[in-house]
């Protein structure tokens, strides 16, 4: 498909720079695709989720934890020092991270970069250099020691549409983590889950909604624009994820009982679809996924999708168009812009119904 079909104009004022407080005060647009008529759009709030979901529904959340993956440092250039910024995006080993560096044009394999924040310092060597500013960094520390050093040296990796307007501050350390954050490794938040509060979670459980956890370590590639003119020519970034055998069993039991699976976020949906077989059964999964979902995809594992509003021409907007229909999502986004919904990571959300039942092409 032509990528320009997924383009739209968004006023700069629609981009949220801070989250709603409390988190469940964010707005929620419920989108029900119409078969023979326009989509039904319902303006609600996140706190209405217990009313909108049914007893027996299974809500699948992503328990990844965002690490402080934005690093400031210097590299030697003759006798001078040149400033450099790194954004870690995928761990490749105990001391190895793939990262986007800028400026990176003059970097060479073997060079050393010294990252610092206050008195904290951390050195890394450029192991290999890739394309578009991507490098493989080998740090002087490994494993848990490296994780602790990153906590001291790194900054919260706010998305570029926020960081270009303001720097990260102390409030982002809490605001950009979800209630479910447990397993460190993400360099971007699974933003649909940012809306959950303990009170909302308790209300959902009291309603009879079952909560299951999966992991997908969201990479910085999630913000990369699609540069290709056709979706067939886009190379999707890989992210590491895991579905436990226990979670897979719970989802399959729910499916056999005719209960709905509700994905909290595109990350939860992508790892579930990666783990699902042709018959919709979910298997235990642990490894990389580079699943790229565009219109025409037949969803196998998910019945409803809770998700934020996404960037134009992004793989995530393509995914929601695949789920609920291209024209439906165009209509929904036009409504959201006109109604003053807040977009992107710190913004409001949609509860999407599918254009076709799962398993249907």
From Swiss-Prot:
Task performed by this protein: Transfers and isomerizes the ribose moiety from AdoMet to the 7-aminomethyl group of 7-deazaguanine (preQ1-tRNA) to give epoxyqueuosine (oQ-tRNA).
Annotated protein name in UniProt: S-adenosylmethionine:tRNA ribosyltransferase-isomerase
The protein's assembly and partners: Monomer.
GO biological process: one example: tRNA wobble guanine modification
Keyword field: Cytoplasm, Queuosine biosynthesis, S-adenosyl-L-methionine, Transferase
One Gene Ontology term of the molecular function aspect: S-adenosylmethionine:tRNA ribosyltransferase-isomerase activity
Family: Belongs to the QueA family.
One protein family per Pfam: Queuosine_synth
Metabolic or biological pathway, per its Swiss-Prot or TrEMBL entry: tRNA modification; tRNA-queuosine biosynthesis
EC number: 2.4.99.17
Annotated localization: Cytoplasm
Swiss-Prot/TrEMBL catalytic activity: 7-aminomethyl-7-carbaguanosine(34) in tRNA + S-adenosyl-L-methionine = epoxyqueuosine(34) in tRNA + adenine + L-methionine + 2 H(+)
GO cellular component: cytoplasm
Organism encoding this protein: Methylocella silvestris (strain DSM 15510 / CIP 108128 / LMG 27833 / NCIMB 13906 / BL2)
Major localisation: cytoplasm
């Amino acid at each position: 498909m032509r990528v320009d079909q997924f383009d739209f104009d968004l006023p700069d004022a629609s981009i949220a720079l801070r989250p709603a407080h409390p988190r469940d005060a964010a707005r929620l647009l419920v989108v029900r695709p119409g078969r023979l008529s326009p989509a039904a759009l319902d303006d609600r709030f996140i706190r209405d989720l217990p009313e909108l979901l049914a007893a027996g529904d299974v809500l699948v959340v992503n328990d990844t934890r965002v690490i402080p993956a934005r690093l400031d440092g210097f590299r030697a250039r003759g006798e001078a020092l040149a400033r450099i910024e790194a954004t870690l995006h995928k761990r490749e080993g105990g001391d190895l991270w793939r990262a986007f560096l800028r400026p990176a044009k003059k970097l060479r394999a073997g060079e050393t970069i010294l990252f610092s924040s206050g008195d904290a310092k951390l050195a890394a060597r450029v192991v290999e250099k890739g394309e578009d500013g991507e490098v493989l960094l080998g740090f002087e520390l490994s494993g848990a020691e490296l994780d602790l050093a990153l906590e001291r040296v790194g900054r919260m990796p706010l998305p570029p549409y926020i960081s270009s307007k303001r720097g990260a501050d102390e409030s982002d350390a809490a605001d950009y983590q979800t209630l479910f954050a447990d397993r460190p490794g993400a360099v971007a938040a699974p933003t649909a889950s940012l809306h959950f509060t303990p009170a909302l979670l308790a209300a959902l459980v009291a309603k009879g909604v079952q909560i299951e956890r999966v992991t997908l370590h969201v990479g910085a590639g999630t913000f990369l624009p699609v540069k290709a003119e056709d979706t067939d020519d886009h190379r999707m970034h890989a992210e590491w994820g895991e579905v436990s055998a226990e979670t897979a069993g719970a989802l399959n039991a729910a499916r056999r009982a005719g209960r709905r699976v509700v994905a909290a976020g595109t990350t939860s949906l992508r790892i579930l679809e990666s783990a699902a077989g042709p018959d919709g059964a979910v298997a235990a999964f642990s490894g990389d996924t580079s699943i790229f979902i565009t219109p025409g995809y037949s969803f196998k594992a998910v019945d409803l999708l809770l998700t934020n509003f996404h960037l134009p021409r992004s793989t995530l907007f393509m995914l929601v168009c695949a789920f609920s229909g291209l024209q439906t999502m165009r209509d929904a986004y036009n409504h959201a812009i006109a109604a003053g919904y807040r977009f992107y990571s710190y913004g409001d959300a949609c509860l999407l119904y599918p254009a076709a039942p799962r398993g249907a092409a």
